[in-house]
């Protein structure tokens, strides 16, 4: 079982060109399945002995643990995919996971902020950030500042420029968090204002960015250089410190590529500082990007290309969100509603 999983993960990495995020999730899900099959002190079961009843017991176990249906569905999808690969490679004659029904998930339309709400939020971004007091130091060394205030205050102020650029690119380009954190200097054409983005399945696409994102990027650029210098200085002073990653566009306080979780925390942080009743996360900005384009008359095929969707049906969910908003306006405004 473990050998089959190792081969499958390598297949995802080298043949399917799956994203690192997908590989980590699938590997974690399959290892959890192995742990269920092998309680402490028990031998590894033979691969051929695993049938649909065992897999159904595993999904029941996950339900007992309190996992959401979406999480159970993802883990079952990983198991199905593993056995499908094993059948193709001649390691099994059947795929027992196909006999286990997927949990029924509610169809949720994306909740989208209005263009006016997002524009107001982004235009007031600096003021929103200035009203906050840093909770902790994000850097141990003060970045360049003519007045030389306290390190925590200085770092918080200059990193606002990075955060502003980060928001502008998430919304202005419709990027996934993984796509934003994966951006390198070689993907950026500042003069033509275009990005080369690597999406799911390592599919590449070209996405333009507007004047607001360009202005935010230019404001962030000297901060980015300071972060690289501070990171290099930190590495010289401290042992076992990883070097900066100057090839990345968006950096953390140590000059290394910012992570997806950090992006999520920043989005939550600034939505909280704005005192708005939003359940905002990075994908909310991607939803808003698509819905606002569609509402202003953009072609659905063009939106599909900008989002990097493989199938048009994936993009069409935004038409449902737009229709829902129209119905809400109708119900509120029409005298005969």
Residue spans for each PLM region:
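Conserved catalytic core of the tyrosine transesterase superfamily
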Residues: 1-337
